[in-house]
Regions:
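Membrane translocator/pore-forming domains, dominated by Gram-negative outer-membrane beta-barrels
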Residues: 241-284, 293-304, 308-309, 332
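"A position-specific structural signal for the A-helix of alpha-solenoid helical repeats
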Residues: 188, 195, 202, 249, ...
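PDZ-domain C-terminal substructure recognizer with occasional recognition of PDZ-binding tails
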Residues: 461-479, 529-546
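Helix-turn-helix repeat elements of alpha-solenoid scaffolds
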Residues: 157-174, 217-236, 286-304
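Flexible helix-coil transition and linker loops at the boundaries of alpha-helical arrays
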Residues: 179-185, 230-248, 302, 309-310
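Non-transmembrane amphipathic alpha-helical segments
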Residues: 16, 23-33, 53, 60, ...
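Eukaryotic intrinsically disordered, low-complexity segments enriched for acidic and Ser/Thr/Pro residues
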Residues: 1-15, 29-186, 210, 271-282, ...
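PDZ/PDZ-like domain segments forming the peptide/carboxylate-binding groove
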Residues: 476-480, 484-514, 519-523
Length: 546
């Protein structure tokens, strides 16, 4: 049934593409006549006809946009509740008969009888016809790949570099339906490769992502789709259609990467059903990572020329996903704080180390160590995270309503409603009637990425030259430690007092403090470092600067 629905959708797309082509030819003819004639009455008649044609074109493009927004047809048929993925429809092409052109070339270039190759030419034409409607499976990918490989041999056998063969390859834009044609075989190759990427998106979207196997298949498909679009972007220039322009392909690569990241998050949740404190923290960071990549895709989609090209429902769905996963990141943070208490001193230290790197900025109030050891403080911070989660869930639902097409998408509405209720239920569980304190603002969650401990990338990067950290021991004098500090993450030594303790120890201006008393502070705020220095006893403090 799904295959039938998908085929019907593709046939409707083909019909609309043909109608758009017809209307555009009529418009081109009318515009030529309007420019050529000087008769006032004829110009009025042509202008009226142009208005009708433009109106028809607008209606056809709106119908095509609705088809491109029909993502539900490509999703898995099971009753599983998953956030839908965005697949691409295939580019349509006209039928093409290369028989006469190839036979003529064989006669004139190779001096051979063209009729001897009737069978091979017919098989090639049958292959081209078949690849126009590939199945949504590995067999469909293999069919496109086989045709793509045959184009390599066709190019070398029959397409001399300085003389075109005399045939035109017609392809329609996958999103607007605008026709394009070129004599260059590179256009045919690029269009087939684009369809390979589009088919991978459809394969990825149809997977059952409630199983690890299904998620792995979806990840593989979306990664391969990203590879197809990336290869096109790097190797195909002067694209005649918008869907194969650099801006559009860059957007598609980012969209595929975001959908891969979403699948990685889903896989993590599937593989960790029995969560503990650290698993919940990591789930929150994985959700924050998904939110970040979708935010980047949304920014790309809202910049011209992509903004005026893609369906509005696409950019809206990406925006909804960004807010949805931001809400989930705060929900998992709240679960980590409220569902798990510390049991031993060693566990407290381990949790404190992990939690000290969890937020982008340190939460207001008591220190991390105190928060984790005090059940009431954990509940307060968890409540702040849940409050933010609920706000982001409601923002996602508000954005969802803005799109007429998304409002019809029951599965997305169901996911948003379910996660919103989940956060509300959690909030009511930890909310006490005697709570008179004002719930604070939960800080954003730091993304989980490798080499995080090396510090902020804007400072600790390969483009800057670094020496090994300088270890110095400072003892507090009448003027303190003899330096002034500025900035956050990392804190900068802004000035050195002449003759002071820091000057005598060899601390230089514009150095960064990376450690205080053995505690890493590359990500520390200004106030945290100052407090650590103030807490130093009579024996002084050991710091490391770079």
């Amino acid at each position: 049934f799904a295959q039938t629905q998908r085929s019907k959708l593709q046939h409707r797309r083909a019909r609309i593409n043909q109608q758009i082509n017809k209307e555009m030819r009529m418009r081109a003819g009318a515009e030529n006549l309007f420019r050529a004639t000087t008769n006032h009455k004829v110009r009025e008649t042509v202008a009226l006809e142009l208005s009708y044609v433009n109106s028809n074109l607008q209606l056809l493009k709106e119908e095509l946009e609705e088809l491109n927004s029909s993502v539900e047809i490509y999703q898995n048929e099971s009753d599983a509740i998953n956030v839908p993925m965005i697949p691409l429809g295939l580019k349509e092409t006209k039928e093409l008969d290369l028989t006469d052109a190839l036979k003529d070339f064989i006669v004139h270039h190779y001096g051979d009888d063209g009729t001897l190759y009737d069978k091979e030419i017919r098989e090639f034409m049958d292959l081209r016809q078949a690849m126009r409607t590939p199945s949504r499976s590995d067999a469909g990918i293999e069919l496109l790949m086989e045709y793509y490989n045959q184009l390599y041999f066709l190019d070398n056998r029959f397409f001399p570099p300085n003389k075109p063969l005399g045939v035109f390859f017609h392809w329609y834009d996958s999103l607007t339906g605008v026709p394009s044609c070129q004599r260059a075989l590179a256009f045919e190759k690029g269009s087939v490769l684009f369809n390979m990427g589009a088919l991978y998106t459809q394969i990825g979207a149809r997977q059952d992502r409630l199983s690890v196997e299904g998620v792995d298949t979806a990840i593989d498909a979306f990664q391969k789709a990203a590879g197809c679009f990336s290869y096109l972007k790097e190797n195909f220039s002067n694209a005649p259609s918008l869907d194969m322009s650099t801006a559009s392909l860059s957007m598609l690569v980012r969209l595929m990467v975001a959908q891969v990241q979403e699948c990685i998050f889903e896989k993590f949740v599937l593989q960790n059903p029995r969560s503990d404190f650290f698993t919940q923290l990591q789930a929150a960071q994985e959700a924050a990572r998904v939110q970040e990549v979708y935010t980047l895709v949304y920014r790309t989609m809202t910049q011209p020329p992509v903004k005026d090209y893609i369906p509005f429902s696409w950019s809206t769905m990406v925006h909804v996903k960004a807010e949805h996963f931001r809400a989930l990141s705060h929900y998992y943070a709240a679960c980590a704080l409220c569902d798990y208490s510390t049991a031993s001193e060693a566990e407290v230290k381990t949790q404190e180390k992990a939690f000290s790197q969890f937020h982008v900025t340190a939460p207001e109030g008591p220190s991390v160590g105190f928060v984790l050891q005090d059940p009431e403080e954990r509940r307060k911070l968890g409540k702040a995270h849940l409050k933010k989660a609920i706000m982001k869930h409601e923002e996602a639902m508000r954005i969802h309503v803005l799109s007429k097409i998304l409002r019809k998408m029951d599965i997305l509405q169901e996911v948003l409603t379910l996660t919103h209720k989940q956060s509300l239920s959690k909030y009511s569980d930890i909310d006490h009637e005697e709570d008179f304190f004002e719930t604070g603002e939960a800080p954003d969650i730091q993304l989980h990425f490798f080499f995080f401990l090396k510090g902020p990338l804007s400072v600790f990067s390969a483009k800057h030259k670094w020496r090994p950290p300088q270890k110095v021991h400072l003892e507090k004098g009448d003027d303190g430690f003899g330096f002034t500090l500025r900035g956050d993450a990392p804190v900068l030594v802004a000035g050195i007092v002449p003759g002071g303790c820091a000057a005598e120890a060899g601390v230089m201006e514009n150095s960064y403090i990376v450690s205080v008393s053995g505690a890493d502070c590359r990500w520390a705020k200004h106030a945290q470092v100052v407090q650590q220095l103030k807490d130093a006893g009579e024996d002084g403090v050991d710091i490391e600067v770079v």
